[in-house]
A protein has these predicted regions:
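Short, low-complexity, intrinsically disordered N-terminal segments
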Residues: 12-23, 55
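Surface-exposed beta-strand edges and flanking loops
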Residues: 8, 18-19, 45
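Residue-level detector of functional hotspots within protein domains
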Residues: 3-5, 19, 39
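Short aromatic-glycine-(Arg/Gly/Cys) micro-motifs in beta-strand/loop hairpins
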Residues: 1-13
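Short, flexible N-terminal segments of the mature chain
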Residues: 18-35
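Short, mixed-charge low-complexity intrinsically disordered segments
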Residues: 31-56
Length: 56
């Protein structure tokens, strides 16, 4: 599984979505947040763990 770093423009929250593709990650982010950024950055497992953001 790959890690995608998002921010939500409405709440200002940063969060991570685990998904195999960027397109799937965007769809998951839209399920949980009103206005997630549409171009997330891929991050490593280590980076995701160290950031400590909520993961979906």
């Amino acid at each position: 599984m790959r890690n995608w770093l998002f921010c939500d423009y409405e709440s200002g929250e940063d969060f991570i979505v685990e998904a195999p593709t960027k397109e799937e990650a965007v769809e998951i982010a839209k399920e949980y947040f009103a206005d997630p950024c549409g171009n997330p950055d891929e991050i490593s497992d280590f980076e995701a763990e160290m950031m400590g953001f909520d993961t979906y």
